[in-house]
């Protein structure tokens, strides 16, 4: 995947995460702040940070619950080396339902 393709997929994914949280968080318990390619989610558990790392072609997640993760895009999913999927972690920790393939 070239840099342009990566940027498009990563930015679409990050925007999708922000949109899904805003749609499903009926009690407005998660403060969503999307600035460029950095998404901050302020929750009662702490602040999540999701951003794209262009040089590594990864999306990084900093979770106040489970720590830091680096995800690479493969076969339509953002997965880390341990096989964990970005959307699965967010679903579990934020109680928001995400499709595994938003793009």
Curated annotation (Swiss-Prot):
Keywords: Iron, Metal-binding
Classification via PROSITE patterns: FRATAXIN_1, FRATAXIN_2
Transmembrane parts of this sequence: none
Gene Ontology MF term list: 2 iron, 2 sulfur cluster binding; ferric iron binding; ferrous iron binding; ferroxidase activity; iron chaperone activity
Isomerase is among the record's keywords: no
UniProt keyword Iron, yes or no: yes
One protein family per Pfam: Frataxin_Cyay
InterPro entries: CyaY, Frataxin/CyaY, Frataxin/CyaY_sf, Frataxin_CS
Disulfide bridges in this chain: none
Any one Gene Ontology cellular component term annotated for this protein: cytoplasm
Any one biological process term the GO annotation gives: iron-sulfur cluster assembly
Lineage: superkingdom: Bacteria
Homology family: Belongs to the frataxin family.
Function according to Swiss-Prot or TrEMBL: Involved in iron-sulfur (Fe-S) cluster assembly. May act as a regulator of Fe-S biogenesis.
Protein name according to UniProt: Iron-sulfur cluster assembly protein CyaY
Source organism: Rickettsia rickettsii (strain Sheila Smith)
The encoding gene: cyaY
């Amino acid at each position: 995947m070239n840099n342009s393709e990566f940027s498009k997929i990563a930015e679409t994914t990050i925007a999708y995460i922000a949109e899904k949280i805003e749609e499903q968080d009926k009690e407005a318990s998660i403060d969503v702040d999307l600035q460029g390619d950095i998404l901050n989610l302020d929750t009662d558990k702490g602040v999540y940070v999701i951003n794209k790392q262009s040089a590594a072609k990864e999306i990084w997640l900093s979770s106040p619950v489970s720590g830091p993760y680096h995800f690479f895009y493969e076969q339509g999913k953002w997965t880390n080396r341990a096989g964990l999927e970005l959307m699965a972690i967010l679903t579990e920790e934020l109680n928001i339902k995400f499709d595994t393939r938003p793009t």
